[in-house]
Amino acid sequence: MSSYVRPLPERDINKVISEPVGLIKSDAMLYCYEDWNPEQPVDARGMSEGTLRFIAIVVALLTVAPHSLLLIEEVDNGLHPSRAKELVDMLKDLSRQRQVDVLCTTHNPVLLDELGNKMIPFISYVTRDENGDSHVNLLEEKEKLAKLMASGTIGRMMVNDKI
């Protein structure tokens, strides 16, 4: 787990642990050790929302049964946009290792760009018709996709309201 979490904050995390807490030790507290002060742990209350969410996703991928489907709403919520690559790499790596299908939602153009063109067959977007009904569309079936891609990235298409 630490190898996936290590690049997240400005100061590298070198170890992640959890310990039982509470009167009857029925709860757990998460701790991270960072390179800048390796003797002083940072508990979950001192971690950013993005770091906690990233760790939760790693734990979910490591503990879900193989051949499962893991749905993650707003996968990058709270995570700094500069960490999109680490998130995408972790999702691809752990889902492949654990044989888990991952379905994620996002509104982040940086994350879409990090997925890259090879992932186009796996990207969908949602539109609404004149009645307000939502429709899920495969990006690879988008009319004039090649022309849109020639003028920018997947994230740029989203920002420009083309998908």
Task: Give the positions of each predicted feature.
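Generic hydrophobic alpha-helical scaffold/packing signal
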Residues: 2, 44-48, 56-58, 76, ...
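Bergerat-fold GHKL/Histidine-kinase-like ATPase
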Residues: 3-6, 14
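Glycine/serine-rich loop-strand microenvironments at binding/catalytic pocket rims
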Residues: 4, 69, 95-96
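Residues at helix C-cap/C′ positions in short coil/turn segments immediately following an alpha-helix
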Residues: 9-12, 65, 98, 119
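Conserved ABC ATPase signature
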Residues: 10, 14-62, 69-81
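Residue-level preference for the first positions of well-ordered beta-strands
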Residues: 67-69, 101
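C-terminal lobe/lid and adjacent interdomain/linker elements of RecA-like ASCE P-loop ATPase modules
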Residues: 86-163
